[in-house]
């Protein structure tokens, strides 16, 4: 199918393509926030977006009979605000729709049925002595650490709720991008980074042995695709049908195997 990839690192509103939210528009403008592998990432050599969410966006655009336009946002918080304001037709960026975070987000946007179950992870440098039990990292283990997290995420919300208020010599700092988080961690500015498990595994795998996962935080989150509140463009039924059909016909399992290495 045809895909228009707006340059990574740039924000381009839907006015660049006309009224993309119109039912007569040939475009489905999907906002995302890279890098967040294996859900969404970008190949700077060939200018191609790729990942689990990108593949699903392609399926959804095809089902709607539209050309997919991927619009990358440098700031995850701005992406969430813009989908709520109708600047993009849909947001596909590993967005948590469950729990307290999801309840707040549902005030300004609407979600598809869940398409992925997720937990969090604590990433540290390979020389760190922090190790969590199989039952997961506890807030008590994290309270004394300097932790970096991406602003506007469910990771930050968890840390604010369970760790920040009980800090004993530690700190929680939000940064705009995942790249800046990784740089701050590897440079020794922070002792740990909290991020969703899937991206944590990808980041560690590509770190050349400099990073490791100290343990998981079992938050039992559900991801959903977000649209403007109330679904004014009436695309949620199609999105939900794509999710349901992909699970029934084996497409979902194939995508999980491709991007996560398992069934």
Regions found by a protein language model. Give the residues of each.
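Extracytoplasmic small-molecule ligand-binding "clamshell" domains
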Residues: 25-95
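Short helix-initiation/N-cap motifs at beta->coil->alpha
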Residues: 70-81, 134-135, 172-187, 220
């Amino acid at each position: 199918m045809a895909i228009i990839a707006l340059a990574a690192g740039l924000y381009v509103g839907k006015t660049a393509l006309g009224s993309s939210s119109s039912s007569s528009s040939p475009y489905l403008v999907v906002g995302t926030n890279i890098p967040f592998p294996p859900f969404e990432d970008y190949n700077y050599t060939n200018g191609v977006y790729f990942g689990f969410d990108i593949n699903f966006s392609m399926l959804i655009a095809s089902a709607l009979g539209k050309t997919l336009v991927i619009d990358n946002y440098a700031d995850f918080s701005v992406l969430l605000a813009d989908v709520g304001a109708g600047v993009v037709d849909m947001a596909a960026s590993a967005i948590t729709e469950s729990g307290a975070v999801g309840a707040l987000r549902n005030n300004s946007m609407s979600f598809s049925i869940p398409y992925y179950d997720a937990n969090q992870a604590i990433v540290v440098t390979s020389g760190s002595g922090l190790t969590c039990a199989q039952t997961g990292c506890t807030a008590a283990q994290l309270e004394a650490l300097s932790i970096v997290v991406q602003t506007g995420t469910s990771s930050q919300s968890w840390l604010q709720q369970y760790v920040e208020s009980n800090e004993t010599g530690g700190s929680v700092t939000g940064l705009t991008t995942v790249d800046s988080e990784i740089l701050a961690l590897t440079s020794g500015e922070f002792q740990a980074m909290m991020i969703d498990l899937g991206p944590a595994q990808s980041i560690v795998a590509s770190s050349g042995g400099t990073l490791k996962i100290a343990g998981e935080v079992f938050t039992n989150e559900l991801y959903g695709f977000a649209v403007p509140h109330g679904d004014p463009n009436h695309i949620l039924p199609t999105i939900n049908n794509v999710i349901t059909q992909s699970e029934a016909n084996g497409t979902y399992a194939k995508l999980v195997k491709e991007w996560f290495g398992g069934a």
